[in-house]
Amino acid sequence: RKCFRNYEKTLANIISKQYLYRANLFLTQKDIMKKLLITSLFLGSCVLLLAQKTTKIPNVYKPVRSEMYKKGWIDFNKNGAKDTYEDPTAPIDARIEDLLSQMTLEEKTCQMVTLYGYKRVLKDDLPTSEWKNQLWKDGIGAIDEHLNGFQQWGLPPSDNEYVWPASKHAWALNEVQRFFIEETRLGIPTDFTNEGIRGVESYKATNFPTQLGLGHTWNRQLIHQVGLITGREARMLGYTNVYAPILDVGRDQRWGRYEEVYGESPYLVAELGIEMVRGMQHNHQVAATGKHFIAYSNNKGAREGMARVDPQMSPREVEMLHAYPFKRVIREAGLLGVMSSYNDYDGFPIQSSYYWLTTRLRGEMGFRGYVVSDSDAVEYLYTKHGTAKDMKEAVRQSVELSLIHI
């Protein structure tokens, strides 16, 4: 016990002092960033990064279409009138209904899509004139991992000029946001997402130990600080949503992603997950998206590629082990996002499960945020689970049965 306490104290000292010191160095651009990151809350979930000129990084905020930016509100649809959805004082439900009534089918579809960023799907780091001819001319729900310093899987890190310093990175994301606000019909901002289970996935951000390593500390205050730093660094870089924490409960050490969980105890996962989310979402700096819902970490034979769990777990195990952390983090920390999992349970893929993603998650657990699918999970309904006859059917199942963000 004494040895364990000494180990915990040493690890806590390393993280809470050295990492905090590094984080403070990371945040020395604060004064510049205050000028760059001018934000307003849009429909209660999208954090709006107001745009700037593309010629250089300005010292003072100066929008291109200045006529859009009124005193106390923004004319997102450029019609010269304050629509209900543009009125920050209007009830949120009224704003949503007004916006939906103005959206075309194409615009609604695009808001359900996540686009991988630079060098993964996007070929451009900053908007070009060609963007008005692309799919995202009607807007896009989210752009994931844009300019975080990584390219396509397996390739070396990007040497893009906007990766660092933080002020330049945030300016570049502002430019991307400017396109969606100023150049699309309704001006709906996009959500800049990134990974963050051991710090923000960015070339220069603080790199923490794995979740499994952090879980061994059993230190709530420490994890809260990790969440606080992760959220703060993400916000300084211009990201608005971080895919963390992982709330899976590790029960089979053969599983290839075991290092990503806090541990084998659902109580431990819940306690540390609560603190991580509270830290990340402190002062509305970013949204936290917990994953993977649900029963993902105990695949049959620990075979990740199979994406199947039945009949590995009984209903009681699912409820007491795997649902428990999500219930508590949603209710006690106000988790804003949930990522659905690849696996099936009892023969039904979670990705298209109305029972799990609507009846249980939104009904019984009281979740009021958004649900995003894991990468390729929609496609897996066709290619892996075989519950859809083609890709169109896979999309239909995902939308009609669970209403998720693809």
Please tell me what each predicted stretch does.
Residues 1-5, 9-53:
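Bacterial Sec-dependent N-terminal signal peptides
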Residues 1, 405-406:
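N-terminal regions encompassing targeting/leader/pre-sequences
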